[in-house]
Amino acid sequence: MSERIVINPEVCGGRPIVAGTRVRVADILAMLAGGASEAEVLVDFPYLKAEDVRASLAYALQAVDHSIVQAAA
């Protein structure tokens, strides 16, 4: 995990957030998936930086990019 993305069990139900905020990584990803640009995300969350958006994407990539292990038949 990057310094920009943190998990605190006492904030936002323990979901990943941008450090120092209550903005969930999922909120940023939902906006991007819905067609918003990085610039539009930053307009909606003016206290974020472009690096926070990129860190959210990197976090999502790390979460889905894992080795697939198959059990022997």
List the predicted regions and their residue ranges.
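Conserved phosphate-binding loops in nucleotide/dinucleotide-binding enzymes
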Residues: 17
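Basic, low-complexity segments
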Residues: 1-13
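Long, charge-rich, low-complexity alpha-helical segments
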Residues: 24-73
